[in-house]
A protein has these predicted regions:
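N-terminal export signals
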Residues: 1-20
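Structured, non-membrane catalytic/scaffold regions adjacent to prosthetic-group chemistry
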Residues: 16-224
Length: 224
């Protein structure tokens, strides 16, 4: 019995290490797989890995930058440390993809989009946000009202850890009330525009808003 307990304890202790190893393998495999088929492989954390390109450069605190520009009075470029120093918000929701998989009660933490917009000073003609990613291909969009909801984050943490490269780190978008394709990975630029510019998947027929069923779709502070 003691032997069995010891083996069980060892298994529990090794579980995080095994999960990190499997996640690292899947992340590396997905970058070498232009088909995206590695996204169907199971992962203990519940997430699947997918990228629309074969390889994504890695960024860290030394090399990462986030630009906020467009129809604003005060364009700015943030370092990772500067983002960490801003007010943070924690949001816990189910993450859901359009192909049916779901990860329940997933915590994200980061800077509310509204904080960055207020700091930039959006001009009256600004109506939407266009998000660009440093994979060089992916992009997304939100209306300005959607972006000001308190459950829209520039996420620095996911599942209580810094967002890993495989999950779109060091910084990604988290659009809590929407399907996960709206939560762009590897975020590098936020541009305020005068109209909504369709994102990557919207050009293939996905819904422009991507609301989850049952979500309050108001674009105001009471929506979350």
């Amino acid at each position: 019995m003691l032997g069995m307990l010891g083996a069980g304890a060892a298994g529990v202790a090794a579980a995080p290490w095994l999960q990190r190893g499997w996640e690292g393998f899947l992340g590396a495999a997905s970058q070498a797989d232009p088909t995206g088929l590695t996204g169907v492989l199971p992962n203990p954390g519940g997430f699947r890995y997918y990228s629309v390109v074969g390889s994504v450069p890695r960024k860290d605190a030394r090399t990462y930058r986030l630009k906020v520009n467009g129809l604003v009075d005060r364009p700015r470029t943030y370092t990772l440390d500067e983002l960490r120093a801003l007010p943070q918000k924690r949001v816990v929701r189910d993450v859901q993809c359009t192909d049916g998989w779901r990860v329940a009660d997933t915590p994200f933490e980061g800077v509310p989009l509204s904080v960055l917009l207020d700091a930039a000073g959006v001009r009256p003609e600004g109506k939407a946000l266009h998000f660009t990613c440093f994979d060089g291909v992916y992009r997304e969009s939100l209306t300005l009202d959607q972006a000001r909801r308190p459950d829209m984050l520039v996420a620095l943490k996911m599942q209580d850890k810094p967002v890993s490269h495989e999950h779109g780190g060091p910084v990604r978008l988290y659009a809590a009330p929407m399907y996960f394709y709206k939560s762009a990975k590897w975020l590098s630029e936020i541009t305020v525009t005068d109209e909504v510019i369709p994102g990557y998947w919207e050009e293939y027929g996905y819904d422009l808003d991507g609301w989850l069923d049952g979500e309050d779709r108001r674009g105001d502070a009471q929506a979350a």
